[in-house]
């Protein structure tokens, strides 16, 4: 059983118990979600399902059946389930020697009702960190909404990554999603903004993307 599934999705007595389905900001993406594949141009170099150290080792994907959905919108079957009901991901590349991972996300990031960060932190990030990963590049152009909850897991992730000389960079997250993160005061745990908001990352090899993002991060940290 995954670690996060053993933890309570705790809500305080004053927390809203129900939130109506959000009106997603990009309607055209709604109807096309089943056609959006995770980036696949690096698959000849890395596949998480064949990586014995990956949380997704041994994962199988149907080419014909849509097994995942965000509300009533089916997702392409190549996306991986991280435990959330609305947020899915793909580990595009992991380099254990250099200590970094490039992770792509799709769906709705809902900490308020789903405590999505708990699943991400406990079941994905922690196993990766146990194998020396401390630098995380999160690609979020297909994250359509963000709903804030508690910041405990963000704080924990930030502290643990920082202690290992690492960081968490957000790449190409939508403006309204970044605004919602800033409003919840969790942007302080990430590197975001500037070049990271408009990077043509698909044109890079993974090590070149890491070098570019790492250079930006170092300039930001040294500013």
Residue ranges and their predicted role:
Residues 4-11, 17-26:
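Short polybasic linear motifs
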Residues 29-81:
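N-terminal catalytic cores of peptidoglycan-degrading enzymes
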Residues 34-43, 176-223:
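A cross-taxonomic marker for long C-terminal extensions/tails that follow the last structured domain
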Residues 74-119:
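STAS-typified acidic loop motif
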Residues 104-109, 126-150:
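Short, glycine-/small-residue-enriched flexible loop/hinge segments at domain edges that mediate gating
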Residues 119-122, 150-157:
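Charged helix-capping and loop-helix junction motifs
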Residues 138-144, 169-179:
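Short beta-alpha junction loops
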Residues 146-154, 179-183:
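A short acidic (Asp/Glu
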């Amino acid at each position: 059983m995954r670690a996060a599934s053993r933890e309570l999705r705790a809500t305080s007595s004053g927390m809203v118990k129900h939130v109506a389905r959000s009106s997603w900001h990009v309607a055209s993406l709604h109807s096309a979600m089943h056609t959006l594949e995770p980036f696949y141009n690096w698959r000849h170099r890395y596949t998480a399902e064949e990586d014995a150290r990956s949380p997704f080792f041994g994962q199988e994907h149907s080419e014909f059946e849509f097994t995942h959905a965000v509300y009533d919108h089916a997702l392409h079957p190549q996306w991986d389930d991280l435990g959330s009901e609305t947020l899915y991901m793909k580990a595009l590349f992991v380099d254990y020697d250099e200590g970094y991972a490039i992770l792509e996300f799709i769906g709705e990031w809902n900490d308020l009702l789903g405590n999505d960060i708990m699943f991400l932190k406990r079941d994905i990030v922690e196993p990766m960190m146990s194998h020396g990963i401390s630098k995380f590049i999160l690609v979020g152009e297909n994250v359509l909404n963000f709903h804030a909850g508690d910041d405990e897991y963000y704080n924990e992730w930030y502290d643990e990554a920082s202690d290992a000389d690492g960081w968490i960079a957000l790449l190409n997250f939508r403006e309204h999603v970044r605004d919602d993160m800033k409003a919840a005061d969790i942007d302080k745990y990430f590197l975001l903004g500037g070049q990271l908001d408009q990077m043509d990352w698909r044109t890079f090899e993974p090590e070149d993307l890491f070098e570019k993002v790492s250079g930006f991060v170092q300039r930001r940290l040294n500013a």
